[in-house]
Every structure is written in C-alpha cells, then in structure tokens.
Amino acid sequence: MKFNDYVENLQNYEAGKPVELVVREYGVKEDDVIKLASNENPLGTGKKAVKAIYKMAKHANLYPDDSMFELKGALADKYGVSEKNVIIGAGSDQIIEFLIHAKCNENNGILTAGTTFSMYGIYAKHAKAKHFSTASKFHDLKEIKELYESHKDEISVIFLCVPNNPLGECLDAKDVIKFIKSIDDDTLVVIDAAYNEFASFKDKHKHIEPAEIVKLKNAIYLGTFSKVYGLGGLRVGYGVADEKIISALYKLRPPFNVANLSLAAAVAALQDKKFIEKTIKNNFKEMKKYEKFANATGIKFIKSYTNFITFILDESKKSSEISQKLLEKGLIVRDLKGYGLNAIRITVGLPKQNKRIFDELRKLLG
C-alpha cells in the first residue's frame, strides 16, 4: 500500500524504553529495573490523584465531560485567568500539534533552538512545514531573533522550551517576555513550560506567569501533568493564552480527547500541595548528588532547572555504548546520540535509584 510521500519519510519519536522491554529482552527482574529515561515522577502518583482515579473508575463506561469544566476551572483559578483562556489536551504535545496545524503550511514553518524537544520538528513535518533552527544548541534569544528577522515571512511559530528538554538550561522570565514583545503580532510564540514548576523553585527569576502570557496576544503557555504532578501515564496537558488563540485551537480538538479518569486525577493533583512540594524537594536534594558525582568523576554536565540532568561524555566513551551497558543492568537512561550529542540524560530518581546509577557509571567511566 502506498502512503503520502511525506509520511514515508517521517521519523518516529524515540520514547524511553519501557520496563517490560528490559525484563523481556535482558532477563532483568522487574524489581531490579530502574527507569530514569523519560523524566517521570520517581515518587509515583499522589494519593489524592489515586483516590480520584478509583472514584471515577466506575464511570469508565461513560464518555468524559467534553467541556472539561472542572479542570479548566481549576487551572483558571490557579493562574488567575478566564476559563476561556484554557485548553486541555491529551498531553501538551497534542496542543503542540494543534498549534502547528493552525499556523503552518508548505510555505512557512517553525523556529526552534538547535537542540530541543524533537516533537516540534516531527509535527512540523506532519504539516509539510519548514523547520528553522539555530546553530547554537542552547536557547540563545539573540540568535533566535536574528534568524527570525532573516526569515520572517517563512516563520509562523517560534518554540521556546523553558526550561529546555533535553539539555536542562532555562531562560529568565523577563527575557522571554521581552522577546515575545519584539516579535510580530501574527507570529505565535509558544512557551513550552513542562518543567517550569522545577525551574521556579530553583530560581524565582525563571518563573513564567501564564496570566502575563495571556496579555501578550501572540503567545501561549503550555503546561503538563506528566512531570511534577506524576500523571505521565494519563496524558493531560494544557495551554493558556488569549481567547482568540484558544478558540482557534478548539476547532482542531477532537471530541472527548482526554479520558474522564485523567481529568479527575488532574483536578485532584492540582490540590495535592504536599505531594508537589515533596517531589520538588526530593528532586533538587538528589540533583546536588548528581552534580557532586559529576565533579568528582570529571564528567561535564549542564546546570539543570528540571527533573533531569544531562552528562556530556568524554570522546573516549560513546553515549550509545554507555546507555546500552546500563540497560543490560536494568538501568534505563536516555541516550542523546539522536540529538547529535555524545551525552546521556538521566531523570533524577530516589536516593537508592540514584546510588545504583552512580555505582554503575563509576565502573563504566572509571
């Protein structure tokens, strides 16, 4: 069967390997497998969210409330915006897909940093759109602006991943706002803030307020419940923007796109302040251990404002080989070879999990 040419040439997103695969292919006992590849919450899911899931489970035969009234209201209250400024998606990446289809075509496209979340480029290809990226792997706003000015007629969406995945660096909020104000009104600036709860805790200057983004008219703030809220398996994300932007995106949203269990869990997760605080504090307490380990062993690392850390390996050690050897031991990390980096990205886990990573890396890199 023949498919459209652009489909034949599309690349698949490389997700972190599941625990089941490691058990099956390498014979590691399930209890010995540690997954630190996908930036999931190592503490699991909060009690309030779990309770909400159990309560909603008896209604699994029913379609969800398509208005998503409760979750939209909870997010609107949290951020001090109107419910008309909020859209809910099956993960924030679904909203990224909506945005690209709403703004891009064969004659224009997106602009990103050199190394950033790969789904931006993949969705651009879905829309047969162009993809401009900076030479710098990091978010250099000066370079991004220069590239935008030189291709202004061909760029309709600019993605800023704040903090950036997979590197972990983070722009200051004031610089992001200043940048957005310098961009033409018809060019949409997307603030992908999947890890912003972590960045805001580490440095208040990194905190981006969605209500400020709403005022700018040409920008949207994206958040997710997959990281600090511990709901990666339920796929819930959201966008906060001017009402006109949200209204346009709703025309692309399929009905019942987020399950009722997911909606109920997300509402409960927003209220679970103790779980959120515990998650963030564990993350940065353990992050210090990763930094100490890297300094002691001579590994270069990127200062991270997220729940992961990226280790840049020496040329004598290949990231693909190191990640494979870790995998054979039941330790799942993310090889960044596909991003053109000799590096591995490791989700910050629990103390015992992190100790195993350190012990194995010492053997492999020593």
UniProtKB/Swiss-Prot annotation:
Homodimer. Keywords: Amino-acid biosynthesis, Aminotransferase, Histidine biosynthesis, Pyridoxal phosphate, Transferase. It holds the Pfam family Aminotran_1_2. It catalyses: L-histidinol phosphate + 2-oxoglutarate = 3-(imidazol-4-yl)-2-oxopropyl phosphate + L-glutamate. InterPro entries: Aminotransferase_I/II_large, HisP_aminotrans, HistidinolP_aminotransfase, PyrdxlP-dep_Trfase, PyrdxlP-dep_Trfase_major, PyrdxlP-dep_Trfase_small. NCBIfam families: hisC. The modification N6-(pyridoxal phosphate)lysine is found at residue 227. GO terms for biological process: L-histidine biosynthetic process. CDD domains: AAT_like. It comes from the Bacteria. Pathway: Amino-acid biosynthesis; L-histidine biosynthesis; L-histidine from 5-phospho-alpha-D-ribose 1-diphosphate: step 7/9. Transmembrane segments: none annotated. Its cofactor is pyridoxal 5'-phosphate. The keyword Transmembrane helix does not apply. This is Histidinol-phosphate aminotransferase. GO terms for molecular function: histidinol-phosphate transaminase activity; pyridoxal phosphate binding. Belongs to the class-II pyridoxal-phosphate-dependent aminotransferase family. Histidinol-phosphate aminotransferase subfamily. It is an enzyme of class 2 (transferase). Its EC number is 2.6.1.9.
